[in-house]
């Protein structure tokens, strides 16, 4: 499939759904050729010894995290909400633990497709995710020990600098990642930053894919030739205050590539910006 897409210059993304034991035997290759991974625990649980399923889930998450690709945990997350307005305690813990393990996204299926309480299911999952992300149990501003080093060290150096800066800048309200491909945004996401990442991108398809990554909200912009100058910073200040609720005196971290911040070149720039 990857060869066919490449041959036709397609930018479609491949999210591989892991549901067979045979996939586990080739999981490293599958992750390499995929843009993201879904742990489909329903079918996987049928063909895998039930006591092994939590180990399999954690292993897939760690391997996918290590190469900075999004990983989705799905199936029977809040299964009881197909019939009931509240989940079981075990289900709430299951969702939380998937996020602690490193899942970028958790996914509902039958709860919203055929359940009696679809809106409530989404609302409760959102609350669980937000609370666990803000808890002391989450890794914050730290990269996992398993993360692979980069052949292109500059974007990784920027991402590490962002993580280190956030540790020492308690007033920071967000990371503004100006990107053409989302590459550095994905790197920064893997450190599980203590603040939201706002991924500014001209390409709507890239922006939608970035939404899968932990802590990332994508914002579409119309001009990829943005430069760091006085007028651009004034516009950014107004946007951050009006659209994102930030205030004068708040700080954000800006990343991009100079001279044009979203030119498609590797990220080579980081700036601490105080909103005025």
Whereabouts are the PLM-identified features?
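Non-catalytic helical/linker scaffolds that mediate oligomerization, partner binding
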Residues: 1-276
């Amino acid at each position: 499939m990857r060869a066919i897409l490449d041959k036709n210059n397609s930018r479609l993304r491949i999210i591989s759904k892991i549901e067979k034991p045979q996939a586990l035997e080739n999981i490293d290759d599958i992750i390499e050729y995929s843009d993201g991974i879904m742990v489909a625990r329903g079918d996987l649980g049928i063909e895998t010894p039930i006591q092994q399923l939590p180990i399999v889930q954690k292993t897939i998450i760690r391997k996918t995290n290590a190469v900075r690709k999004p990983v989705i945990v799905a199936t029977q997350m809040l299964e009881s909400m197909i019939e009931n307005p509240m989940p079981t305690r075990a289900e709430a813990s299951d969702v939380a633990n998937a996020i602690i393990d490193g899942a970028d996204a958790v996914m509902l299926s039958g709860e919203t497709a055929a359940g009696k309480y679809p809106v409530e299911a989404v609302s409760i999952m959102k609350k669980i995710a937000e609370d666990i992300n803000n808890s002391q149990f989450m890794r914050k501003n730290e990269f996992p020990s398993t993360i692979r080093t980069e052949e292109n060290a500059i974007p990784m150096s920027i991402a590490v600098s962002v993580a280190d800066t956030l540790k020492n800048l308690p007033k920071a309200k967000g990371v503004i990642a100006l990107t053409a491909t989302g590459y550095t945004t994905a790197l920064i996401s893997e450190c599980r930053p203590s603040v939201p990442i706002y991924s500014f991108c001209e390409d709507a398809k890239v922006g939608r894919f970035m939404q899968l990554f932990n802590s990332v909200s994508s914002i579409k912009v119309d001009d990829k030739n943005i430069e760091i100058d006085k007028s651009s910073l004034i516009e950014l200040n107004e946007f951050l205050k009006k659209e994102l609720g930030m205030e004068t005196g708040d700080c954000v971290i800006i990343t991009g590539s100079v001279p044009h911040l979203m030119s498609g070149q590797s990220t080579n720039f980081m700036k601490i910006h105080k909103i005025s």
